[in-house]
Amino acid sequence: MTDHEYHQLAEALMFTIEEQVDDCEADLDYESAQGILELIFPDNSKIVINKQAPLHQVWVATKFNGHHFELRGDKWIDNRSGAEFWQFINEASTRQAGQDVKWQSSL
């Protein structure tokens, strides 16, 4: 994958989440700047999603732990646990919000 392709795909991933924040039943907010997306929860905790361009990865930090996702085929996969990004971000957001949160891939 070229650097250009990586940036397009990583930005699309974050944009997909941004587009869904207002429709989310949990009272979430977000801030986005320079390849970093912060999801802000009602208790002021955050999930931080950021691009790691040199590694062609997307890193996710929750209040519980951190994960590094890399593109395998057409899915972002955690390089330690093997979890798929959308499944992981739904579970992590639900856990952090204390209520059901569902994000959907745009693919």
From Swiss-Prot:
Record-linked InterPro entries: CyaY, Frataxin/CyaY, Frataxin/CyaY_sf, Frataxin_CS
Keyword Metal-binding: yes
Entry-linked PROSITE patterns: FRATAXIN_1, FRATAXIN_2
Keyword tags: Iron, Metal-binding
Source taxon at top rank: Bacteria
Gene3D superfamilies to which the protein is assigned, alphabetical: Frataxin/CyaY
A GO CC annotation given for this chain: cytosol
Any Pfam family matching the protein: Frataxin_Cyay
TM segment ranges: none
Gene Ontology terms for molecular function: ferric iron binding; ferrous iron binding
GO biological process: iron-sulfur cluster assembly
HAMAP family: CyaY
Family named by the database record: Belongs to the frataxin family.
NCBIfam families: FeS_CyaY
Role according to the record: Involved in iron-sulfur (Fe-S) cluster assembly. May act as a regulator of Fe-S biogenesis.
Official protein name in the record: Iron-sulfur cluster assembly protein CyaY
GN (gene name): cyaY
